[in-house]
Amino acid sequence: KIIALLVLFTVILFSSAQAQTTAHKFEAGKNTFLLDGKPFVVKAAELHYTRIPQAYWSHRIEMCKALGMNTICIYIFWNIHEQEEGKFDFSGQNDIAAFCKLAQQHGMYVIVRPGPYVCAEWEMGGLPCGC
């Protein structure tokens, strides 16, 4: 149940690759996740947008989809976004919104793990400077 609640709060559900956006209902059923009332299996791949040059984001997402994945999991690496206390950078290579929109264009869902700790062999676990 805890995992289900965590997923409910951290999943960003996107529509298909078409331009129109549709609201989805994601919930935990008795023995399965439900998307719009139908059983849904999360088939997720982990991608670290900070480790992939922005020019390759689309290709990597396509590769995940080709492997049968329907979801991309991402961490937010706070030590990249807040290199100086109180000053945040979500531009260019650090543009989480652009990465998520790109996943949406490929018909993928995204699970965002905001941290602050990152369990991905990352310096200081991704904690922002000054911690």
Q: Language-model features: where?
A:
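Aromatic-lined substrate-binding rim segments of carbohydrate-active enzymes
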Residues: 57-130
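N-terminal carbohydrate-binding accessory modules
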Residues: 18-71, 101, 105, 109
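Bacterial N-terminal signal peptides
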Residues: 4-14
